[in-house]
């Protein structure tokens, strides 16, 4: 796997943490507050992202997509009900699992055959799918930003350019 793909995943971890940091600054009830949006609440968005990320690492580790989807369905209500600090901890532990997995270079380009119940078999690799994991998180962080604005709050900046400036800018 290229350094870029790994750095992209590190960006994803950073961006998620920016969202958690911002949410913890706001009134506690905003996390579960119902908002007229794509998801009924911010807690539902973060649950969805977490369960999707969990599903992909399960698939990368050898589970079937059907098993990963079943696990997500089994954990859905439980994760939606968690408080922000509990979800932050779940995301942290999941990111540690990803990083340990991604450090196993031999796994990254091993062929995967993923059976999707509705669209057949996809032949791919972890390296090819990892940008999807990051892109999916980016998309839903945008949902959270829109939901926060709708509720009268600013979000946290999470764009990749800012991440690069924060991690690559030399101190004068």
From Swiss-Prot:
Per the record's keyword annotation, is Metal-binding included, yes or no? Answer: yes
Residues binding a divalent metal cation, per UniProt: 48, 136, 140
Q: Which domain of life is it from?
A: Bacteria
Q: Does the keyword Metal-binding apply?
A: yes
**Listed GO MF terms:** metal ion binding
Entry keyword set: Metal-binding
Pfam families associated with the record: DinB (PF05163)
Quaternary structure? Homodimer.
* Family, per entry: Belongs to the DinB family.
Q: What is this protein called?
A: Protein DinB
Q: Which gene encodes it?
A: dinB
């Amino acid at each position: 796997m290229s350094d870029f793909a790994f750095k992209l995943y590190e960006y994803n971890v950073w961006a998620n943490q920016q969202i958690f940091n911002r949410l913890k600054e706001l009134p506690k009830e905003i996390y579960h507050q119902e908002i007229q949006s794509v998801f009924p609440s911010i807690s539902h968005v973060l649950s969805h992202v977490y369960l999707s990320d969990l599903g992909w690492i399960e698939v990368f580790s050898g589970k079937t997509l059907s098993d990963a989807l079943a696990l997500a369905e089994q954990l859905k209500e439980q994760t939606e009900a968690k408080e922000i600090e509990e979800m932050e901890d779940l995301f942290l532990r999941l990111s540690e699992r990803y990083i340990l997995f991604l450090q196993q270079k031999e796994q990254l380009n091993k062929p995967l055959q993923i059976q999707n119940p509705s669209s057949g078999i996809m032949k791919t690799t972890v390296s090819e799918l990892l940008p999807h994991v990051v892109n999916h998180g980016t998309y839903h962080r945008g949902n959270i930003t829109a939901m926060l604005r709708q509720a009268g709050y600013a979000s946290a900046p999470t764009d990749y350019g800012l991440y690069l400036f924060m991690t690559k800018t030399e101190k004068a």
